[in-house]
């Protein structure tokens, strides 16, 4: 329970530092790989859900199971979309994929467009906004494991969630 907020924050910070936002290449090349990004997101979500399941609060446990269910539904579609684009571009490096797509040096642009649409829908589902959100659900079910956190741990987990959404 105590390791989740620092781990969640570290993963979100690592992903933020590894994405090529202002440069053509990833500042930290190891973190610019699509496989590393997806497995890091899966690791963070797993520990987030495990934090809820580990607590003695029934609502946090149900929220943790809900997070795992969302992970099972969302992450395969994100992986499939990224792998489809990586297969067309010939690399799993995010910067290389971006350069191939921007220059038009791809063999199947329709496949990349469809993969981009699928990835955008999966990212929107990951955010948990309407219509994929349960607005009528109890706050404990939506937030899940955060019901057990307080103080600096809650602030760190909320900051990591905000970083992941951006």
For the regions a language model picked out, list residue spans one by one.
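Alpha-helical transmembrane segments of multi-pass membrane proteins predominantly involved
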Residues: 1-166
């Amino acid at each position: 329970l105590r390791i989740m907020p620092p781990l969640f924050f570290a993963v979100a910070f690592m992903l933020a530092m590894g994405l090529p936002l202002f440069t053509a290449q990833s500042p930290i090349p190891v973190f610019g790989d699509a496989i590393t990004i997806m497995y890091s997101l899966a690791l963070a979500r797993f520990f987030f859900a495990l934090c809820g399941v580990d607590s003695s609060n029934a609502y946090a446990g149900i929220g943790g199971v809900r997070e795992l269910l969302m992970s099972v539904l969302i992450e395969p579609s994100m992986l499939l979309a990224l792998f489809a684009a990586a297969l067309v571009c010939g690399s799993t490096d995010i910067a290389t994929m971006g350069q191939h797509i921007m220059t038009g040096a791809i063999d199947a642009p329709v496949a990349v467009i469809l993969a981009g649409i699928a990835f955008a829908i999966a990212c929107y589902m990951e955010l948990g906004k309407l219509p994929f959100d349960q607005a009528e659900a109890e706050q404990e079910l939506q937030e899940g494991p955060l019901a057990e956190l307080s103080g600096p741990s809650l602030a760190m987990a909320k900051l990591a969630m905000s970083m992941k959404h951006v």
